[in-house]
């Protein structure tokens, strides 16, 4: 099973690109946090508390399987 990380944008969940998805998966497996490149900018991702900060906006993130 493959896993996909998504973030909440209003009432929809948006998938991260493949590069960011792999980086977030690594952070999650390490119970860690850090900066991830996504959508042409840097986002801080806290994979333990399941949120990201991008352009001073905090968004919920979650891990899905497909």
Annotate each language-model stretch with its function.
Residues 1-66:
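Eukaryote-biased intrinsically disordered, low-complexity acidic regions enriched in Ser/Thr/Pro
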């Amino acid at each position: 099973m493959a896993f996909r990380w998504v973030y909440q944008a209003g009432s929809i969940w948006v998938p991260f690109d493949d590069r960011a998805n792999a980086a977030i998966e690594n952070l999650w497996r390490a119970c860690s946090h850090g900066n991830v490149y996504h959508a042409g900018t840097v986002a801080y991702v806290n994979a333990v508390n399941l949120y990201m900060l991008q352009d001073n906006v905090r968004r919920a993130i979650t891990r899905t399987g497909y």
